[in-house]
Amino acid sequence: MKTFAAYVIIACLSSTALAGSITENTSWNKEFSAEAVNGVFVLCKSSSKSCATNDLARASKEYLPASTFKIPNAIIGLETGVIKNEHQVFKWDGKPRAMKQWERDLTLRGAIQVSAVPVFQQIAREVGEVRMQKYLKKFSYGNQNISGGIDKFWLEGQLRISAVNQVEFLESLYLNKLSASKENQLIVKEALVTEAAPEYLVHSKTGFSGVGTESNPGVAWWVGWVEKETEVYFFAFNMDIDNESKLPLRKSIPTKIMESEGIIGG
């Protein structure tokens, strides 16, 4: 197993056990430079409670969570009874949707896997502002600001979260330490499995706020964790995006970094 290299700065960003200190690894910047991308990658190793990033300043800067918010939204839906259980089917009303893969009946896992925005907008509407606000405070999720509409505050409203806060939230979920039932946390964790390789298991979720412009770019996310043998690695990546053709980079850049660290891949 390779170790994180070229750590040059230590900064206290949080009081939590996982991200109490984070180190800057400038060697990762070559992956961003190669694609002419502005972004950040935070990678934390559970056993050593150590974290690294290519950009200390951006690691703590908050952005729209976009569809990464489906993770807490699903837990809140289960906790409030809006989602009955993991077997509940969300019926398609037959009306055209932005993506063809959303135009069908979906289970919770299916809705997460295809990132079905209409399903989670309906969940949020049924949860309502009061309960939504209560749970975001319980979860210490981002700036906890749900202004901008109950069914879009995470897409174009005022909710913001940093890459560091993302990994903190994911660690709490992994350890079943969120203020939610263990059963509901397990349901969502299972729904987040995106890769099951012989040597490792990836739980993850992407997010995309839209492309924006060159002067005011959107944000693209990939967050999650990797279980490998007895180790767990939590990660959060975000990048500025002004052209949809760059969207695959939200996964390819962090994948290359994790491959170079010996976490995933061959």
Swiss-Prot record:
UniProt enzyme class: hydrolase
Positions of disulphide bridges: C44-C51
GO cellular component: periplasmic space; plasma membrane
Mutation effect (G157D): Increases resistance to ceftazidime about 15-fold in P.aeruginosa strains PA01 and PA14. Increases resistance to ceftazidime about 30-fold in P.aeruginosa strains PA01 and PA14
Subunit structure comment from the entry: Dimer.
Organism: Pseudomonas aeruginosa
Molecular function in Gene Ontology: beta-lactamase activity; penicillin binding
Major location (coarse): periplasm
Activity regulation description: Activated, with respect to most beta-lactam substrates, in the presence of 0.05 M sodium bicarbonate.
Protein name: Beta-lactamase OXA-10
Function per UniProt: Class D beta-lactamase which confers resistance to the beta-lactam antibiotics, including penicillin, carbenicillin and oxacillin, and also some cephalosporins. Confers weak resistance to some carbapenems, in E.coli strain C600Z1. Acts via hydrolysis of the beta-lactam ring. Has penicillin- and cephalosporin-hydrolyzing activities.
Result when mutating K70A: Abolishes catalytic activity
Pfam families, A to Z: Transpeptidase (PF00905)
Signal sequence interval, chain numbering: 1-19
